[in-house]
Amino acid sequence: MNIMYQRKIESKLQAWLEDPSHKPLVVKGVRQCGKTSSVVDFAKKHFKHIVYLDFREHPDYKKLFTPNLDVDSIIMRLTALMPNTEIKPGKTCFIFDEIQDCPQARSALKYFHLDGRYEVMCTGSLLGVNGYKSKEDKREEEEASIPVGFEEIVDMYPMDFEEWLWANGIKPMHIDYLKKCLTEITPVDDALHSRFKELLHQYVIVGGMPEVVGIFIETRQIGKVLATQRRIIDEYKADMIKYALPADKPRIRECFESIPSQLAREYKKFVYSIVRSTGRGRDYAGSLQWIEDAGIIRRCYNTEITELPLDGNSIQTEFKVYMADIGLLVSMLEEGTQSSILEGNLFSHKGAIFENLVADIFGKMGRKLYYFHKNGGIELDFVMRYKGQCIPVECKANTGNSKSIRTVLGHPEKYRVTNAIKLGDYNVGMKDNLLTLPMYMAFLLSEV
């Protein structure tokens, strides 16, 4: 199945190409998020000739970049290996897929940039992940070097909720209408409200992995969706076994497999003793970092106070861990979860699904994630910068205000907060400085 959906990365690729001083591009992101498809599709639209090298599929391509890295030598070796390849200055784009598997190719980006005759676009997953390389690859990497100042890196994520809406036929006029409802604080039309809720419930099950999205849209069969998601999870686990340092391999997998249990708790702070009863941070911190660097999870940090700057006020040792893609989390839960979600129940598992959905939406916007928790009962699911203020965000099923929101809004002199947002199963409204929004409008809460 090779369906191309509209992706936001396209505008970033276009801006890169139109910049007269652009450098070779590296599109970085978790495996299976659509990097290769987006880059190849873009190149086909803009270049007459494409030279595509996949270093994961064809490790023998590495020899094209030894013993030296000048562009003419690389082209000579390449055309000897692939005689029918057409390479013309000004009309050719080189695509280096899975460039992390060939450090010398990444070093060559400097020489392609200085040469200036050809465009280069790369994709990379597991870039910079500790222990990724074998001993042989490490020797290659030591001989190579990252071309600092000679490459541009763009992050790419799985499809976000807005891209999901596009894939399901939602038009710009419909999204503009939602923006208008947010700006004017007016309820969404009942028919559209029902449609967006339905699409949200489906998104929670499917998530944003392009292959999974394609299978759902083509077949509507949840069984096939689940099988594909679990295959992707298995591929992630295989990467953990294949590429991590030997001592880290079991710990990385244990950390990863503990995520549903971590999120099933009332207070969802990541606790190493849930990974293993004798687990300690010093034993598992590097393993968790590996999963985060691979783009599979996102951390959400507790903050000392509800005040900007959030990063400066964050507590680096206290954090929750969410799956970067909500569909993959749901695929890790017990059978029957998908059916419950389609019926509108997003609040099971002690709010884990709902919270991870918000983390998915905010994270794919490029937001760093923060929350606020103090002993004594004050907990805000998320805090974020919005319209220049620190804004608490509550994710709850009920319509009443929680004790935490009432306390924080009732003591602005202590918490330095005057407005809050509540996301849930209701329409747009405002009361006592609390903006209530349907969950499907969370993607409109950009930092600007």
Region spans (language model):
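Accessory nucleic acid-recognition modules appended to NTPase machines
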Residues: 214-380, 387
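Hydrophobic anchor at the beta1->P-loop junction of P-loop NTPases
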Residues: 27
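N-terminal pre-Walker A segment at the start of P-loop NTPase domains
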Residues: 1-18
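Interdomain motor-coupling "hinge/lid" segment immediately C-terminal to the ATP-binding subdomain
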Residues: 124, 130-264
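Conserved lysine of the Walker
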Residues: 35
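Short glycine-rich substrate-engagement loop in P-loop NTPases that contacts/grips substrate
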Residues: 57-90
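Hydrophobic positions on the alpha1 helix immediately C-terminal to the Walker A/P-loop
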Residues: 38, 42
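Active-site beta-strand-loop-beta-strand hairpin of nuclease catalytic cores
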Residues: 384-392
